[in-house]
Amino acid sequence: MNAYSHNLLKEKYPTKQDVITEIMNLEAILHLPKGTEHFVSDLHGEYTAFDHVLRNGSGSIKQKIQDYFSDRMTEQTMQDFALLIYYPEDELALVKKKLRTENELQQWYLDNISHLLEFLELSGSKYTRSKVRKALNPNFVYITEELLYNDPQEFNKRSYINQLLKNILKLDQADKFIIATCYTIQRLVVDHLHVLGDVYDRGEEPDKIMDRLMNYHSVDMQWGNHDLLWLGAMAGSKLCMLNLLRICARYNNLNIIEDAYGINLRHLSRFAEEQYEDNPQFRPKLTNGDGYRFNGEKLQITQIHQAVAMMQFKLEGQVIARRPELKMDDRDLLNKIDYKKNVINLNGKEYSLQNTCFNTVDPKNPNELTDEENAIVDELLISIQHSTKLKRHLDFMMNKGSMYRTYNGNLLFHGCIPADEEGNFCSLKIGSKEYSGKKLFDFSEKMIRKAYSKPNVKDDFATDFMWYLWQGALSPLFGKKSMTTFERYFIADKACHEEVKNPYYKLRENKDFCIKILQEFGFAGDDTNHIINGHTPVKRGHNAICAEGYMLVIDGGYSKAYQPTTGIAGYTLLYNSYGLQLVSHQPFTSKQDAIRSGKDIVSTVRVVKHELQRKSVADTDIGENIKEKIRVLYNLLRNYD
């Protein structure tokens, strides 16, 4: 330790006893049980379902209730108690309607406050008192600690405790105290949240998800392909921006742009109305219960959808020409059309085109935007980059996010490791350098951060590369040979709609391939390590646990569009001191249904790995940091003057 570091530590620990106290505290912390990690993925803007999963900790709260209260509560009482913890405001309102007399309500308050305090003590038992205190509502720290750490059966304190409880009721604080305690329990049951990508996509409330995450106590994120479109737009990529606008129009979610983020689409709407007519291929796709806000909105969105799609295809051609190293010439599609015959040549085969909307395309220079299109794109990008709320959300996503994360022996990422049929990692050549495996992830993250840090630079390689990450064949976030958006719009032959997956998705069933990936990212690759992967829904009949447990696929299945394919609403993962648990969920209808029916959406919990010896903080990454700090403090102690 150099003299400067030594002096800094002495300032923090001014006496020898301060050093001893801190060492004792840290060494004790190492023996506490490991905190629970909660893994979710592919939220796709579905806020209410995601919020429910956070509130119930993927079933962990209900499980703790059953373990602790099953000999004292009926099944119905346990269900009601769980719902109280999930949705305290709603459950309190329901209870007040059910109970007939003031005495019944007072007794209900006393019973449930007592149960909540017991459950709070259980939930906080794996943490230091200091950490529990930080999780408490500031308005109730003193009274909660007095009730929590005193035995009501102790004779000398019995009257004191009873009076505290009576005063909570007498001063009309029962509701506030119960609500605060329930949210503290939610916070303590899960120590850390991992979000494996795609907050954004077709769902209508990604902004609420971002607000929720920004207020969450401990979270990290691994970026998904849909997230990259929004990050790319904020970084200055017009092409990323047009893609996200097209997706919002396609799924009738332009209100995200206009209402949630305050971006004006008036010029775009007027231009689309002038240039485009109704087109069945571009009508919005509606999910159950979805509809239109006003007469004529369906046509308006259909026209906007066509306008942004055509601008997107033009700019794709421009970026492809500007970046030959990305080898995407096969996607310069507007240059492959015979506009007189209305056909396109793809891979040596000619296809007729249908539902075309090439009004603004100049056959001699098909990738050129018109003057008005240029003006619209520039205006929209300025509006997006100046949306205070969107900037706040995406800055948070950048700060908390990464292409991948290694955490407590596990490797987390959203998409894939591009590979060939033999299991060799594919290389992307940029200039004189080649990037594959971990290096490809690191290079991708470097480009994302570079582009995001220079939002006024709109045509550099880093900004263009963000679009490549959306749909490039060797993108770790895409995982397919090509994105056939154009073909789906304009070609009837469904054979050319197919998007061929990278061999990775077959190879990840193989144990040796998964071990190879783990070793690529610095792990030993033994049975203490796992890959946790999102991005692809687990289809009905397929297994979320692959390669003898080395690979866990946890696409959350929040998007309603995928649920008929999967048969469920996807998976989440819990990793506590006892091991790994894969949780499958049933589709979430609404908060009101959950409260009214009393049913949860957790259907099955499957133990992936049960630890023979319960894991402690010492076995975690945080534990390693604490051990290093202890070593430094012992060194300081030995050399203390």
From Swiss-Prot:
One of its GO terms (molecular function) is fructose 1,6-bisphosphate 1-phosphatase activity. It catalyses: beta-D-fructose 1,6-bisphosphate + H2O = beta-D-fructose 6-phosphate + phosphate. GO terms for biological process: gluconeogenesis. InterPro entries: FBPtase_class3, Metallo-depent_PP-like. It comes from the Bacteria. Pathway: Carbohydrate biosynthesis; gluconeogenesis. Keywords: Carbohydrate metabolism, Hydrolase, Manganese, Plasmid. Its cofactor is Mn(2+). Gene3D superfamilies: 3.60.21.10. Its EC number is 3.1.3.11. Belongs to the FBPase class 3 family. This is Fructose-1,6-bisphosphatase class 3. It comes from Ligilactobacillus salivarius (strain UCC118) (Lactobacillus salivarius). The lineage of its organism: Bacteria, Bacillati, Bacillota, Bacilli, Lactobacillales.
